[in-house]
């Protein structure tokens, strides 16, 4: 028998997906977000949020395990906020999205 362990893939837990989808459903209903995608890798998981169907993700919630569970919110490779708490990252996203209108 082969006793080699398969590498564990990082994923979002059920309650984490629920928290993200709760906000996602609100944002999609007001037309701010259009779609999402989820990626799972050995060292991280990403919930990507798309504001347009033509372009790549506008926002990414990334979960990784370096020392502990850690969440990062980024937009176009710029880190907006990071925390050990998913709730803090989601609260950052709850702020209204403001656009300058001329």
Regions found by a protein language model. Name each.
Residues 1-8, 78-102:
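Mixed-charge, Lys/Arg-enriched low-complexity segments
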Residues 1-43:
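Negatively charged, low-complexity tracts enriched in Asp/Glu with abundant Ser/Thr
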Residues 2-3, 54-78, 95:
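Short aromatic-glycine-(Arg/Gly/Cys) micro-motifs in beta-strand/loop hairpins
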Residues 32-60:
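Amphipathic, interaction-prone secondary-structure segments
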């Amino acid at each position: 028998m082969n006793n080699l362990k398969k590498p564990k893939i990082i994923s979002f837990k059920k309650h984490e997906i629920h928290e993200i989808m709760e906000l996602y459903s609100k944002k999609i209903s007001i037309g701010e977000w259009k779609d999402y995608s989820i990626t799972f890798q050995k060292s991280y998981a990403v919930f990507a949020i798309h504001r347009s169907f033509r372009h790549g993700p506008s926002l990414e919630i990334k979960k990784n395990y370096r020392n502990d569970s850690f969440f990062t919110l980024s937009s176009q490779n710029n880190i907006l906020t990071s925390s050990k708490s998913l709730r803090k990252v989601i609260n950052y996203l709850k702020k209204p999205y403001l656009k300058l209108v001329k």
